[in-house]
Amino acid sequence: MAKIPVTVLSGYLGSGKTTLLNHILQNREGRRIAVIVNDMSEVNIDKDLVADGGGLSRTDEKLVELSNGCICCILRDDLLKEVERLVKKGGIDQIVIESTGISEPVPVAQTFSYIDDELGIDLTAICRLDTMVTVVDANRFVHDINSEDLLMDRDQSVDETDERSIADLLIDQVEFCDVLIINKIDLISEEELAKLEKVLSALQPTAKIIKTTNSEVDLKEVLNTQRFDFEKASESAGWIKELESGGHASHTPETEEYGISSFVYKRRLPFHAKRFNDWLESMPNNVVRSKGIVWLAQYNHVACLLSQAGSSCNIHPVTYWVASMSEAQQTQILAERQDVAAEWDPEYGDRHTQFVIIGTELDEEKLTKELDACLVNAQEIDADWQQFEDPYQWQIRPAR
C-alpha cells in the first residue's frame, strides 16, 4: 500500500492558514483529502467543502477537531491515533493538518518520524510527512517580530505556564518549513514586500517562497510535493547555515541590495556576564535573529545557548564544556569526537563563543566592537571570575 502524503499548515493566528485550507478543498480536483484541524477556538473551516464530494462527508468523520490546545507532546497521542484511524479506514489520497496558530511545527513533524511502542502505532509505515507549509502575514510579520508581547499578553497562551513570546513563535514557524507562503501581499508596498522576502530568505534560505493574496496557491506547491526531509529541515534555518559556513554562506546581491546581511561572531575569550547581558538588553532593533553558543566567565564550566528573535532574547546553560570534565572523560570524548579535537585549545579546551547575527542594515564592525568590549579584558583575565557581578544567578553543579 502506498503511503499517504501528509501536509502540515503552520502560521501565526490570522496569517491565512484556514483560508489556505478552504482554497485546497475548493480546488482539490478529485483528490480525496482528509483534514485534521487543531485550533484553540471553534473549527472555522467551511465544513460544507469537506462534505461536498469525494466521499469526504461529515458522517465519515474525515473532518476532525482535536482537543483544545496546540499539537504538542500532550496531544501527540491524539494525533497519532487520529492519523492511523484515517489511513486504515481508507478512501483518502492525502491528509492535511491545520495546526493552531500558537503551535510550533517541530513536534508535529516528530510525530511522523518515530514508532510509538506504547500505543503500538508506526505512522512511518502507513504515511509520510510530505510538506511543511508556513503561512506568514505580510502586513503583520515585521510588527509582530518586533513586539515584546508574550502569547499570554494577547490571551493566546496554552495555559498560565506558557511564557513563549510572539517573536520566538514566529521564528520557530519560519525556520522549520519547506514551503513559505507570504500572504496578504496586497496590504504592503512592493518595496516592503521585497525587503520582507529577503528577511525571510535569510531566516529560512532553503524553503520555496510563494507570494500571494487570500492564500491562493497552486496546489502542486503544497500537496504531494515530496519536499520534506526531517534531517534537512532540522538543518535548514539560516543561522545554522551561517554557522556551518563559518560566516561565509553565500549571500545573493538582491539580499545585500535590501540591506539584509549576517555574520558570525567567534571568540576564544569569555564574556563578562554583566556586560554581555547589558548589551543584550540594548541590542539594536535591526538585529532580527541571533543564535549560537556563548562562553560566560562567571559560568566557566558550562556552555550557554543564546537565542534571540526580534525583541525576544533568551540565554541559558545547555551543557558542560568538555574541558570542565575529568581527564578520563576528556580523553574519551576527544578520541570519539574529531570535531571537538580539531578545535581544542591548549589553554581553554573547547570553550568558545560562536553565534550568528542576522539583520537589516547591520554595521558588522560596530557590533563586533561592542561585543568585544563585553569580553573579559586584560585587567580581568587573571582575576577570580566568580567574583564578577552576575545578572543570572544560575545554580549549576560543577561537572564531575
Q: How would you label these PLM feature ranges?
A:
Residues 2, 42, 141, 150-353, ...:
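C-terminal accessory "lid"/substrate-recognition subdomains
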Residues 2-168:
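Nucleotide-state-sensitive switch-loop elements of NTP-binding domains
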Residues 22-23, 81-85, 110, 194, ...:
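Solvent-exposed alpha-helical segments within well-ordered globular domains of core cellular machineries
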Residues 47, 76, 106-109, 190-194, ...:
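Conserved strand-to-helix beginnings and helix N-cap segments that scaffold or border functional pockets
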Residues 48-53, 197-200, 369-372:
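Short, aromatic/basic amphipathic alpha-helical patches
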Residues 354-359:
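A short beta-strand structural signal in non-transmembrane regions
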